Each structure stands twice: as structure tokens, then as C-alpha cells.
């Protein structure tokens, strides 16, 4: 069941941005080579809100700024319980497949590269994560946010089913 987890940006949300990857692109023309840059940026308030954006420009700083602006327009709310995720979840985007699993307090963020940036930006402090397939940062970021967006805590499940929280746990 698709649940709308979209968040509208307001001034009271303080977002921190993290650069996931930067790529230099070369365009060969008759007059020589023209360089441009693309940047994948993740923004989050470290309290359950996450967004990602891709910025492209002739300068690195301009590409990052465009990525941040794009990320602010693409925010999603994620349930974070006691510094970890509520349950196991896997997702696939393109050739990248990710698996996210809750961890006990003190474990830390056990994840690599692009997944680590996303999980830290959303405010998860203890989690086990594994990626399979492609290590392309674009697809890893999208797959990780897709997996996080599919997370449901007990309150959300009870609300969707129209039953009490006790009935969710007792069956």
C-alpha cells in the first residue's frame, strides 16, 4: 500500500547537507574539451526527514548548490525508533540492491559509501546495511531512500489497518 510520506519544506526544518559523489564530465567539441560537474547531495534533519538531489553545473560549488536545492524539493519522512530502523527492509533500484536491518544500541552505522551518507542524514545511529549488485552512487542513494520510505512503525500499521496498537502486537 502506497503511503504518502512527502514533506513540504518550511523554514523551521533545519537541514544538513552531505555530498555523496561528484563527477567530472567532459564534452569534446571542435574548439576543445569543455568540463562540467555533477553532484549527488543528500539533505536531512537527522530526525527522520531525508531528501536527495542531483545538481549539474560548470563549477563544483554551483553543482553542489543546485543539488541541495533539488534535494529540498524531494523530502521524505522516515520512521526512526531509538536511533535505528523499525524492521528489516530491502529495495532495488536499477542494478543496486540494498538490505537494511535494525541494530542494537552501540552498533553504529555499518554501511558503505552512499548508503552511509543517507542513513546518517536521516538520523539513524545504529543499523546494519548491505548493498549488492551495482555500486553506482546514484542507484544506491535511490535504493536506500526507497527502502527507508517503505518502513512502517507500529503506529503507522495500526492507523492503516484501523485497529489499536495492542491488536497489532497481539494479533
From Swiss-Prot:
**Keyword annotations from UniProtKB, A to Z:** Ribonucleoprotein, Ribosomal protein, RNA-binding, rRNA-binding
- Give start-end of the signal peptide: none
Domain annotation S5 DRBM: ranges:
15-78
Q: Name one GO molecular function term.
A: structural constituent of ribosome
Q: Which Gene3D superfamilies match?
A: 3.30.160.20, 3.30.230.10
InterPro entries linked to this entry: Ribosomal_Su5_D2-typ_SF (IPR020568), Ribosomal_uS5 (IPR000851), Ribosomal_uS5_bac-type (IPR005712), Ribosomal_uS5_C (IPR005324), Ribosomal_uS5_N (IPR013810), Ribosomal_uS5_N_CS (IPR018192), Ribsml_uS5_D2-typ_fold_subgr (IPR014721)
Q: Tell me which GO cellular component terms the UniProt record holds.
A: small ribosomal subunit
The record's listing under Pfam families reads: Ribosomal_S5 (PF00333), Ribosomal_S5_C (PF03719)
Could you state one GO biological process linked to this protein? translation
Report the domain remarks: The N-terminal domain interacts with the head of the 30S subunit; the C-terminal domain interacts with the body and contacts protein S4. The interaction surface between S4 and S5 is involved in control of translational fidelity.
What do we know about how this protein assembles, alone or with others?
Part of the 30S ribosomal subunit. Contacts proteins S4 and S8.
Task of the protein? With S4 and S12 plays an important role in translational accuracy. Located at the back of the 30S subunit body where it stabilizes the conformation of the head with respect to the body.
* Protein family according to the UniProt entry: Belongs to the universal ribosomal protein uS5 family.
Could you tell me which HAMAP family the record lists for this protein?
Ribosomal_uS5_B
Q: Which NCBIfam families match?
A: rpsE_bact
- What is the protein's name according to its record? Small ribosomal subunit protein uS5
Q: What is the native source organism of this protein?
A: Phocaeicola vulgatus (strain ATCC 8482 / DSM 1447 / JCM 5826 / CCUG 4940 / NBRC 14291 / NCTC 11154) (Bacteroides vulgatus)
Organism placement in taxonomy:
Bacteria, Pseudomonadati, Bacteroidota, Bacteroidia, Bacteroidales
Amino acid at each position: 500500500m502506497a503511503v504518502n510520506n512527502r514533506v513540504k519544506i518550511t523554514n523551521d526544518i533545519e537541514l544538513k547537507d552531505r555530498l555523496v559523489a561528484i563527477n567530472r564530465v567532459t564534452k569534446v567539441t571542435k574548439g576543445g574539451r569543455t568540463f562540467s560537474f555533477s553532484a549527488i547531495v543528500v539533505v536531512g534533519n537527522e530526525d527522520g526527514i531525508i531528501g536527495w538531489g542531483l545538481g549539474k553545473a560548470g563549477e563544483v560549488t554551483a553543482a553542489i548548490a543546485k543539488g541541495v536545492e533539488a534535494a529540498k524539493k524531494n523530502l521524505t519522512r522516515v520512521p526512526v525508533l531509538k536511533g535505528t530502523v523499525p524492521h528489516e527492509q530491502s529495495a532495488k533500484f536499477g542494478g543496486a540492491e540494498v538490505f537494511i536491518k535494525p541494530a542494537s544500541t552501540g552498533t553504529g552505522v555499518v554501511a558503505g559509501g552512499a548508503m552511509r551518507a543517507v542513513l546518517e542524514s536521516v538520523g539513524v545511529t545504529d543499523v546494519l546495511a548491505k548493498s549488492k549488485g551495482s555500486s553506482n552512487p546514484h542507484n544506491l542513494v535511490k535504493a536506500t531512500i526507497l527502502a527507508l520510505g517503505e518502513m512502517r512503525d507500529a503506529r503507522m500499521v495500526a492507523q492503516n489497518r484501523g485497529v489499536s496498537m495492542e491488536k497489532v502486537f497481539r494479533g
